[in-house]
Amino acid sequence: MARYNRIKVVDVMTKNPLVMTPAETIGQADELMTENRIRQLPVVDEGALLGIITDRDIRSFLAQSALVEPEERAKVLRTNVREIMTAEPLTLAPDDDLREAIELLIEEKIGGIPVVDQAEGLVGIVTYVDVLRCFLNRLEEEQA
């Protein structure tokens, strides 16, 4: 069990994740998430992390407009990501322990955490799927 304590965020994170800019639309974010089967997208401007948008953010925002006319709904989908993103999200550093990432995912009930370098530039994202994949790989290695 002690060898699991040595796992770092960089060992499991998704490097160079798909991202959005603050000026892109909710519709574009929803489409990108659906096409790639992901649930969160970091929002960046020139490589600097500004926030994160999740499928939950989008569903919640769209639920507020569920009863509007189709033309209005189309307008809602053109809302900029910056309007509903979570600004200044929790972040991790590549050399943080995976245990810290897991604790944050559980305590905050979130699906992913952006990983930034010392200059606050986005270098990856660690999700609960990344964590599960890591442990599945370790289990398979132990059984081999």
Model-derived regions: residue spans:
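Tandem CBS (Bateman) regulatory domains
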Residues: 1-16, 54-90, 97, 102-108, ...
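The conserved cystathionine-beta-synthase
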Residues: 20-37, 44, 85, 91-109, ...
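A glycine-centered beta-loop-beta connector
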Residues: 33, 41-57, 105, 113-129
